[in-house]
Every structure is written in structure tokens, then in C-alpha cells.
């Protein structure tokens, strides 16, 4: 009803992991076109959907200590989603430690702590090094990592929420390969939440070429269909106009197909477009072609400030909903 679509992919075997190119685990994608609009009711519904999935992947049967890590550079708007989420959180760990649950009027509550580790250019340290030290000293039961992502398609920019129970590799979307925040590196479960906030120039060009190719394909098929209809109308004619036949044309005629002088040209047009689409490496090719002039260029929406602001509240409210209001 609200045009929200959720896709859950579970990779449970090593063969599946190799095929998908991802570690074993659960991957959840929530597609919500309305996220680009500041509609409080719509965003509240998305928060509830995210909270429901967080409750499914995190074992919340007992009281837990949860560390929320806001990845990204708070000085760059498109990369500041994680820091904004942590700033919006209701942090409870210190209050429960000092004053007990009674100070919050609760009999049971998860202890939430948060950290904004910044980026290596600001701290001189890997994010993984900072988080490892915090995990070692504060001993949380699990980590929730929030980060802005790079979209592979312009259509997913700011309108999809991705969750995973396999952790995250900071900066990998924009070519900065850093140490991962995973259960293997931290020793505790790591859950990742991300929203694509930038899209590469290569992705925009790739989408455009793909759309143009699809239009050309439809046009060729439409013209071909019109010609077939015209041929049927002229069925009363005793003989079609023929030109020199190729071996392929002879085979077509032998199998009961019709052949006219227009068909070789039309057949070549049909064959050309699938050939273009068959190349799976097209995206990498586009990146290489753009590299000399544009390099690793990334684009953001014109209203990125506003989007980061209300999307950060959507995520922080989802975390609150999962940890404070779970049954």
C-alpha cells in the first residue's frame, strides 16, 4: 500500500557465498521510493520495518549491551549519515551504570553506547583499530554499524535501506579498502545498516546506456512486429520478393520460416543489441573509459543536507524501536 518492498537473501553454504561473492549470512534490502520525500508517517513506517528486521537478526531475549558505531566523515554531508544517527540516539549505558534502571523508569532495558570514530584522515587510525579498542574495554554484546553507501544504480540513491548480519568494510564502496568490522575481527556479532547517499559517474552513464539500449531494442521489435503484420495482410500475394539467399536464410526457409529481402537487415539489427547487452563487464568498461577524464567522481542529490537529516532520524528511531520496544 505504501509501495515498500523488502527482499531477504540468506546465504547458508560456502558454495552460495562463492557464487554471490559475499560472506554467509542474511542480507535485507528495503526499497522505499518515498524515502526521498520528507513524509513523517512514511518514514515512521520504514523505521518500524527496519526495527522488525533488527529484532529478527539480533537475539534480544536477554538484556544486552549494544555499541552503535556511526561511520563516516561528519564534515562531508554525503558521508555524515552514521555520525548523525549516533547523535540522535538515546544513549543509556552510562545512566544505567551510575543510577540503575530505576532512573529510567524501566525494569528491563538494553544498554546503548555510541561512538563516532571519524575517518583515518582525521585520526590517523583505522576505524577497526578504534572500535577494537572500545570493544575490548567496554565489552558490548553486539555492535550495530551505520554507514552511508555508494549506489550501483542512480535509482537506488537514498531510497533503499540495506541491513546485514555480516558486518561491513568501511569505504569499500568508494574504493577506500579498510579493515572490516566483522564478527571475525571484533569477536562479537556485527550488524550493518546502510543507505546509498552517493552514486558514481560510471553508474549514471551505465544506467543511461542501459535505458537507451532498451529503447532501441523496443523500437526494433516494434518495427519488426509492424512488418510481420504487413506481411500477413499481403498473404494473398502468390510470391514474396526474394533476393540472394545466405546459408542461414536457406535454413530458415527449410524450417518453415518466411524470407523477404528486408529480413536480413532486420535480423542483423536484432542480433546487434543482445550482443551489446550480453557483456557483463560493461560497468567496469564504463569505469575505465571515464577514468582518464572524471576519475572516481561521485554525485549526490541536490537536497543532500535535508535527506541526511531526516534519514538519520529514520535509522535512529528504528534502532530505538528495536531495542527499547521489543517484546
Report each predicted region and the residues it spans.
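Conserved acidic residues
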Residues: 66, 141-142
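Glycine-rich phosphate/diphosphate-binding loop of Rossmann-like nucleotide-binding domains
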Residues: 73-110, 114
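Extended, charged alpha/beta regions that create polyanion-binding interfaces
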Residues: 1-63
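A structural-propensity feature for long, helix-poor, extended segments
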Residues: 104-134
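Gly/Ser/Thr-rich loops at beta-strand to alpha-helix junctions
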Residues: 71-81, 121, 148-152
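A structural signal for small-residue-enriched, beta-sheet-centric alpha/beta enzyme cores
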Residues: 115-116, 145-326
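Short glycine-rich or small-residue beta-strand-to-loop segments that form or flank ligand, phosphate
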Residues: 29-33, 65-76, 114-118
Amino acid at each position: 500500500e505504501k509501495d515498500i518492498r523488502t527482499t531477504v537473501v540468506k546465504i547458508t553454504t560456502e558454495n552460495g557465498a562463492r557464487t554471490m561473492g559475499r560472506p554467509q549470512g542474511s542480507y535485507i534490502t528495503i526499497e522505499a521510493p518515498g524515502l526521498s520525500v520528507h513524509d513523517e508517517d512514511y518514514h515512521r513506517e520504514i523505521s518500524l520495518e527496519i526495527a522488525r528486521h533488527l529484532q529478527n537478526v539480533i537475539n534480544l531475549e536477554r538484556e544486552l549491551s549494544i555499541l552503535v558505531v556511526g561511520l563516516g566523515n561528519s564534515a562531508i554531508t554525503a558521508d555524515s549519515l552514521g555520525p548523525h544517527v549516533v547523535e540522535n540516539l538515546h544513549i543509556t549505558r552510562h545512566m544505567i551504570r551510575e543510577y540503575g534502571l530505576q532512573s529510567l523508569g524501566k525494569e528491563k532495558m538494553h544498554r546503548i553506547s555510541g561512538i563516532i570514530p571519524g575517518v583515518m584522515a582525521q585520526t590517523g587510525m583505522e576505524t577497526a583499530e578504534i572500535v577494537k579498542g572500545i570493544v575490548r574495554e567496554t565489552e558490548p554484546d553486539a555492535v550495530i554499524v551505520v554507514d552511508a553507501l555508494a549506489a550501483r544504480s542512480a535509482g537506488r540513491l537514498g531510497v533503499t535501506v540495506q541491513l546485514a548480519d555480516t558486518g561491513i568494510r568501511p569505504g569499500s564502496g568508494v574504493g577506500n579498502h579498510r579493515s572490516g568490522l566483522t564478527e571475525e575481527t571484533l569477536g562479537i556479532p556485527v550488524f550493518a545498516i546502510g543507505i546509498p547517499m552517493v552514486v558514481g559517474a560510471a553508474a549514471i552513464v551505465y544506467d543511461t546506456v542501459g535505458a537507451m539500449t532498451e529503447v532501441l531494442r523496443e523500437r526494433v521489435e516494434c518495427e519488426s512486429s509492424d512488418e510481420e503484420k504487413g506481411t500477413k495482410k499481403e498473404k494473398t500475394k502468390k510470391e514474396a520478393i526474394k533476393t540472394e539467399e545466405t546459408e542461414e536464410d536457406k535454413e530458415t526457409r527449410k524450417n518453415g520460416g518466411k524470407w523477404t529481402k528486408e529480413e536480413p537487415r532486420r535480423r542483423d539489427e536484432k542480433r546487434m543489441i543482445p550482443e551489446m547487452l550480453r557483456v557483463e563487464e560493461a560497468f567496469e568498461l564504463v569505469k575505465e573509459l571515464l577514468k582518464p577524464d572524471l576519475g572516481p567522481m561521485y554525485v549526490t542529490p541536490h537536497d543532500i543536507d535535508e535527506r541526511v537529516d531526516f534519514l538519520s532520524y529514520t535509522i535512529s528511531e528504528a534502532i530505538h524501536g528495536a531495542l527499547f520496544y521489543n517484546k
